[in-house]
Amino acid sequence: MSFSVEVLAGIAIELQRGIGHQDRFQRLITTLRQVLACDASALLRYESRQFIPLAIDGLAQDVLGRRFTLEGHPRLEAIARAGDVVRFPADSDLPDPYDGLIPGQESLKVHACVGLPLFAGQNLIGALTLDAMTPEQFEVFSDEELRLVAALAAGALSNALLIEQLESQNMLPGSSGVFEPIKETHMIGLSPAMTQLKKEIEIVAGSDLNVLIGGETGTGKELVAKAIHQGSPRAVNPLVYLNCAALPESVAESELFGHVKGAFTGAISNRSGKFEMADNGTLFLDEIGELSLALQAKLLRVLQYGDIQRVGDDRSLRVDVRVLAATNRDLREEVLAGRFRADLFHRLSVFPLFVPPLRERGDDVVLLAGYFCEQCRLRLGLSRVVLSPDARRHLLNYGWPGNVRELEHAIHRAVVLARATRAGDEVILEAQHFALSEDVLPAPPAESFLALPTCRNLRESTENFQREMIRQALAQNNHNWAASARALETDVANLHRLAKRLGLKD
């Protein structure tokens, strides 16, 4: 056997050294890559007929954002169906899911691959994949040795999943409650900002509190609402969605509370509103700041007393609904301006959440790009869609004013452009395929930084100086607001508010 007792003991010890599951997983695959002298290793979690990367070593960073469906990846399907070690020869007809995703080897095909399915009892919970550019790399290791590695990895993953399930079910000591754990909701990201958001979602999901979700347009507030609902005791009941900004004033009340036959012209039958549809479930009110003051008052009554009245009906109906609301506005400012009721604001914001803009999420941009690349690959029937190193740098240097939604559209557009200029079913996205509307701003000359403005009064001079300071900080930090705030030694939220007041942003 090529594995000594010391090597196996070392792997087991590494699994105990990490502070958290993610650290342990990373130590595991890094150690395996070193022991097996292979080019890449990955630990994948199995869920809903797809493999979700948990930790990687030797692979492009965007792999962590990809979701590998069994239907789209025959090698992974073979691993999922097998109950034992799977070896793919160098001349295998099945494409490797990591072709083009090993840094420095983007144009080469992976030659050797070993897949180790991971089980908890009889249930498939994940897989280990090992890849090498040398065809004979894994021949010196027997199946028995690889099974031992798989057993160690399966034990670590099984324990992590069990703890995650217990935490999401509030069944750890000192808590109670039984309901489904949070499932995959495509909330992709490992940045500190997203890690904190996920923790806050787990905290509030198991309660029955109303939640106000804030954040810029395109940040993914609806995904946050879905994650909260899926992690709650109401998950077995419906999550009903309503975009308040798309509601004409004439039908808004009927959409929310329903109507009876004959209540108004065109009301030819009784109709349930969104609150009735969401009874015993969750109602997600997107763009809550767009509701009129009159409707805000009626919404407040529902939150206070739990009853509604259909339009044209004198009777009240009891409903049990949890309300999640989202807005891209600063509702505190809306309250001060008299456009939003203070009492409703306080009812909704029992547990406020803020979804960070993409420009403050660092390398999450690359993970999300990988996710969208995989989506495009499946949708267009391509064998692979990968990002070149220049494309990754280009995406990281862009400010993403449209956030995740803009990134999604940019990836889809780039794939179409790249496909049109390259024959075959393989697409490599280069920087020139991204026609981004806002280029990285060059740094201004140093001597202009403290140039004094010429204005009539102190207030105007101060505001002009503040504008110039903010513009220069943004230019020097690639239009990254968080980095600019740090450079100016101020809070990023305060910087956004000041920039808005000075007319530097909408």
Swiss-Prot record:
Residues 187-416 form the Sigma-54 factor interaction domain. Residues 481-500 bind DNA. One of its GO terms (biological process) is phosphorelay signal transduction system. SMART domains: AAA (SM00382), GAF (SM00065). The modification 4-aspartylphosphate is found at residue 57. Pathway: Nitrogen metabolism; nitric oxide reduction. CDD domains: AAA. InterPro entries: AAA+_ATPase, GAF, GAF-like_dom_sf, Homeodomain-like_sf, NorR, P-loop_NTPase, Sigma_54_int, Sigma_54_int_dom_ATP-bd_1. Keywords: ATP-binding, DNA-binding, Nucleotide-binding, Phosphoprotein, Transcription, Transcription regulation. GO terms for molecular function: ATP binding; ATP hydrolysis activity; DNA binding; DNA-binding transcription factor activity. Pfam families: GAF, Sigma54_activat. Required for the expression of anaerobic nitric oxide (NO) reductase, acts as a transcriptional activator for at least the norVW operon. Activation also requires sigma-54. This is Anaerobic nitric oxide reductase transcription regulator NorR.
